[in-house]
Amino acid sequence: MHAIVVCGAKQYLVHENESIFVEKLAGKVGQEIQLDKVLMLDEKIGKPYLEKAKVVCVIEKHGLKSKIKLIKHISQKHHLKRYGHRQPYTKLKVVRFIHD
């Protein structure tokens, strides 16, 4: 089975017993969460979401992605500014699908 779910502002194609990386979610490691914004489940398509369809996931870990380095340079002023950013994420494991 597979499904397309919305988590945050992004859509993810998920399969059972698969891990996905999503934007950071509130919750502790090992906590079970339900994603109820299901756009598609196998061959069923929602308008826009499927009613009574959920994807049950378990939080595996929280972390930070690799650092992105940015440089702001103004040539005439001899100015150089360096920035860095690490995006937080949550790793989810898909346990099962609930539907009617």
UniProtKB/Swiss-Prot annotation:
GO cellular component, as recorded: cytoplasm; ribonucleoprotein complex; ribosome
Pfam families linked: Ribosomal_L21p (PF00829)
PROSITE patterns: RIBOSOMAL_L21
Disulfide bonds: none
Keyword match RNA-binding: yes
Keywords on record: Ribonucleoprotein, Ribosomal protein, RNA-binding, rRNA-binding
UniProt record, GO biological process: translation
GO molecular function list: rRNA binding; structural constituent of ribosome
InterPro entries for this protein: bL21-like, bL21-like_sf, Ribosomal_bL21, Ribosomal_bL21_CS
Keyword field contains Protein transport: no
Family the UniProt entry places it in: Belongs to the bacterial ribosomal protein bL21 family.
Quaternary state and interactors: Part of the 50S ribosomal subunit. Contacts protein L20.
Purpose: This protein binds to 23S rRNA in the presence of protein L20.
NCBIfam families in the cross-refs: L21
Protein name as it appears in the record: Large ribosomal subunit protein bL21
Organism whose genome encodes this protein: Mycoplasma genitalium (strain ATCC 33530 / DSM 19775 / NCTC 10195 / G37)
This protein's encoding gene: rplU
